[in-house]
């Protein structure tokens, strides 16, 4: 809250300590850092990524996640994900100790 009220700027390391910077890379290695993050995201179900993004964006627009859920009767992308093949594939792959094969449906 203090940063919002004062407009105080912070560097990358402090931003990471505060939790709004994911990774601080040495000079010249930001592309490699971004690729590491992209690779981790790509390991996830496309439907779960879509649902997560929808929840965050709708929550910002509605003044909070709870307000957005109430306004929409829940998040459409979350409902779709919970009825998807990917919803079954994640726990199944975990139980079988193998990487999941996401279908995006």
What are these regions (language model features)?
Residues 18-19, 97:
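Structural motif
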Residues 8-14:
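Short, glycine/polar-rich helix-capping loops at beta-to-alpha or helix-loop-helix junctions
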Residues 3, 55, 59, 76-82:
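Helix-loop "lid/cap" segments that line or gate small-molecule binding pockets
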Residues 15, 52, 94:
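Terminal peptide-recognition signature
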Residues 1-8:
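Short helix- or helix-capping micro-motifs
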Residues 12, 21-69, 102-105:
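C-terminal long alpha-helix characteristic of the crotonase
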């Amino acid at each position: 809250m203090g940063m919002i009220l004062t407009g105080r700027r912070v560097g990358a390391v402090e931003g990471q300590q505060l939790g709004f910077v994911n990774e601080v890379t040495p000079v010249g290695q930001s592309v490699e850092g971004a690729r590491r993050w992209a690779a981790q995201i790509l390991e996830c179900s496309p439907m779960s990524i879509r649902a997560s993004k929808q929840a965050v964006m709708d929550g910002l627009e509605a003044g909070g996640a709870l307000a957005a859920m109430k306004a929409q009767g829940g998040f459409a992308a979350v409902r779709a994900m919970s009825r998807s093949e990917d919803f079954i594939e994640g726990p199944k792959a975990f139980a079988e100790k193998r990487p999941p094969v996401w279908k995006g449906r």
